[in-house]
């Protein structure tokens, strides 16, 4: 066939269509393949099982009057059950006051539906000090309200209620802010012997065994913390009024958090903060918090880099978020990195919810954040941005030598009804610390301002509408 101009045009057009088709096919295949990784992760997360014996705390002297301190009775029941090979510690109907509860391997704490556990607000009830992390920094501090260290096969289940009783008159005032009850002359974590001292220990890499906080240091304990544990189940209970972070799995793996209701609007009341954890499922939970609803972390600054353990292989699905600084969050204590995160089918909305999807770090904290996949998120109202990536979080910390890298982030099928920004990204000048961000098939309505994207590398928007206008690039 003679190669005239018409034939050449037809051939070029045919090749172009073929290339577009192949590219689209590869994109679909690639997206499908990425989410297959989530199925693989899910297959590795297995809920723990427990021996059949049941140990009622009433048989160990617990009193359900809401006034008697039951710390010894509850922990005696746990010790007895552990020495008997494990089983279920039953919290029956009634109101029980307690201090720190320390779980042991092969123990399930089960709350009957009308059971309520009140936690003392006396700091002395959380001594002796235990090894922990506080805001991503290693130390010895007050025991978390419920704590486990180096355990396997542990659980808290049942439709009862855990109440930390924190408020402006006790733990929250330690923040050092008037909004949470602090007054001039009162001690707080801002004292030289508090948070600033721990920050100094971190920077100077003082041995952890010398970092003794606790009394007169005013660092609030988290509600639930499991440190270097395996095979964890948290299911069905309501948890409220935490002193600090609410659920804090730390350096742990094979974790299931399912059907939990978090109602805790105090300062730093993050809902669920897996830190340097692997293989995590957070499913069907409700979060109404005073800080981030779910925040993935991996240590702060030099401590995080010393461990160098990312949070990885996390699935979040079918959750609802109400109040909070962010719905799905990565950071800011993220020095060990974060990867292979899959979030889908969540709903979030509140005038007191600042952002829906949030990544936050800076050049002091650093961290590589990569392979993040988020889809099918329904957002009603947020007060700031639907999607925010901030590599200059807390600029008062100054510039550091550990620039972060946020890359390979895939966000699709997001709808929102009201926000100041649809997308807000802030990188670092002269650095490409935000790159390969893909936002597709999203519709943002009721947006007040243009998207703000500064100091970022490749950001691709495909089939994205803001206030009804297509903004593909």
Task: Explain the meaning of each model-derived region.
Residues 15, 19-473:
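Extracellular/periplasmic carbohydrate-active domains that bind, remodel
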Residues 1-11:
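Bacterial N-terminal signal peptides that target proteins for export
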């Amino acid at each position: 066939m003679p190669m005239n101009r018409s034939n050449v045009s037809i051939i070029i057009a045919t090749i172009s269509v073929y290339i577009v088709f192949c590219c689209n096919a590869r994109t679909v295949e690639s997206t499908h393949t990425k989410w297959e990784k989530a199925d693989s992760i899910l297959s590795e997360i297995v809920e723990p099982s427990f021996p059949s014996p049941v140990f009622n705390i009433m048989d160990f002297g617990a009193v359900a009057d809401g006034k008697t301190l039951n710390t010894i009775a509850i922990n005696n029941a746990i010790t007895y059950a552990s020495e008997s090979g494990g089983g279920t510690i039953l919290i029956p109907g009634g109101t029980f006051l307690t201090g720190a509860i320390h779980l042991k391997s092969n123990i399930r704490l089960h709350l009957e539906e009308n059971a309520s556990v009140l936690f003392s607000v006396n700091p002395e009830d959380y001594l002796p000090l235990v090894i922990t992390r506080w805001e991503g920094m290693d130390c010895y501090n007050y025991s978390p309200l419920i704590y486990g260290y180096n355990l396997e096969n542990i659980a808290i289940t049942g439709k009862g209620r855990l109440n930390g009783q924190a408020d402006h008159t006790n733990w929250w005032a330690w923040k050092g802010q008037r909004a949470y009850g602090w007054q001039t002359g009162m001690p707080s974590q801002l004292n030289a012997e508090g948070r600033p001292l721990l920050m100094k220990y971190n920077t100077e890499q003082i041995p952890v065994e010398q970092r003794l906080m606790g009394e007169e240091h005013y660092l609030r304990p988290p509600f639930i913390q499991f440190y270097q544990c395996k095979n964890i189940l948290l299911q069905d209970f309501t948890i409220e009024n935490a002193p600090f972070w609410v659920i804090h799995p730390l350096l742990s793996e094979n974790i299931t958090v399912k059907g939990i209701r978090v109602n805790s609007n105090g300062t730093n009341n993050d809902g669920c903060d897996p830190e340097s954890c692997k293989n995590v499922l957070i499913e069907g939970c409700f979060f109404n918090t005073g800080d981030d609803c779910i925040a993935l972390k991996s240590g702060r600054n030099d401590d995080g880099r010393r461990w160098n353990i990312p949070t990885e292989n996390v699935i979040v699905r079918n959750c609802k978020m109400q109040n909070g600084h962010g719905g799905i969050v990565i950071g800011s204590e993220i020095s060990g990195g974060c990867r292979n995160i899959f979030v889908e089918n969540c709903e979030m909305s509140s005038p007191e919810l600042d952002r829906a999807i949030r990544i936050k770090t800076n050049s002091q904290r650093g961290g590589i954040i990569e392979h993040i996949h988020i889809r099918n998120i329904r957002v009603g109202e947020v007060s700031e941005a639907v999607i925010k990536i901030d590599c200059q979080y807390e600029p008062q910390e100054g510039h550091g030598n550990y620039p972060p890298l946020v890359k390979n982030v895939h966000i699709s099928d997001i709808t929102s009804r009201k926000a100041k920004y649809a997308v807000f990204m802030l990188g670092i000048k002269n650095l490409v610390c935000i790159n390969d961000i893909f936002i597709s098939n999203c519709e943002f309505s009721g947006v007040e301002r243009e998207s703000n994207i500064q100091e970022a590398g490749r950001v691709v928007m495909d089939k994205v509408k803001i206030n009804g206008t297509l903004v593909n690039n």
